Regions:
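Terminal targeting signals and extreme-terminal segments of soluble enzymes
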Residues: 1-120
Length: 120
């Protein structure tokens, strides 16, 4: 079982430049104040961004990731991450991601840069 398997991730491909991942709510994801833990939010954003960046037949490991937490997710049947290509260069792929709950209010945003290293 991989780390990502723990989250029961489901994927919806919108187009070659956009995808959405979702995970079902689990009590295990809550922090001490009863909101979804920031680590879960960042993991989902990282997976969505990474899946998208690595979908072009290239190996593209993460160079950097910046996350901004905007509001807590308190109650939600699912947690979603929508990743979109901002720029796809020959050496760097930049992906923006928004994380939100069922209410569609943005809880966090991230920008991740990936280094295109080689073909798969």
């Amino acid at each position: 079982m991989s780390f990502s398997d723990y989250f029961d991730i489901e994927k919806e491909i919108i187009n070659e430049n956009c995808l959405i991942l979702k995970i079902p709510f689990k009590e295990d994801y809550l922090n001490k104040i009863g909101a979804i833990h920031g680590g879960v939010i960042m993991t989902l954003a990282d997976n969505a961004s990474g899946d998208l960046a690595n979908s072009f037949g290239m190996v593209a490991p993460t160079l950097s990731m910046t996350t901004h937490f905007l509001r807590p997710i308190i109650e939600s049947k699912y947690i979603f991450a929508k990743a979109e290509i901002l720029k796809k260069g020959k050496r760097i792929i930049t992906v923006d991601c928004t994380v939100y709950g069922d209410d569609k209010k943005i809880a966090a945003t991230s920008r991740t840069e990936f280094s295109v290293t080689r073909k798969k």
